Amino acid sequence: MQNYVDAKFRILQNQTKDDAFIFWNDDPIIAREIAKRHPEATLYPFAETHENGVKGYTENNQVVIETANGTFTMEQDLLALTGTHNLYNSLASGIASKIVDIHDEKIRASLSDFTGVEHRLEKVLRVRGVDYINDSKATNVNSCWYALQSMT
């Protein structure tokens, strides 16, 4: 497992103080590795709830992104994609967008009308009130769990 973690964290080797490292703050493995590696990049953690130092989070049904370029907010219910994993993806992409100073209106529009990608919780059709969804990318237990969780 550590070899896999080391491979994923190689990205930090070439990052400088001028770069951004956006990461999920709630994962204890990520937290441990960041503490161990002392990255030079500016850290942009995100989490489901507001904690000290977190740059992307939800609070009172609002998605909140805080960077040096300002604060972005939008109603969580307006996110186009459902599920916790898609919330995390929205927080990460929102942070990246604010870092490069994309206008709030464009971020809001993107997060509220993004249709997803093929084979990932792709809505195929509805027949007699039953939704048929193509999630053929969910090839492991974790992917299936997040997909099913997003439907409740």
Enumerate the language-model features and the residues they cover.
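Acidic, Mg2+-coordinating active-site environments of NTP-dependent enzymes
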Residues: 1-132
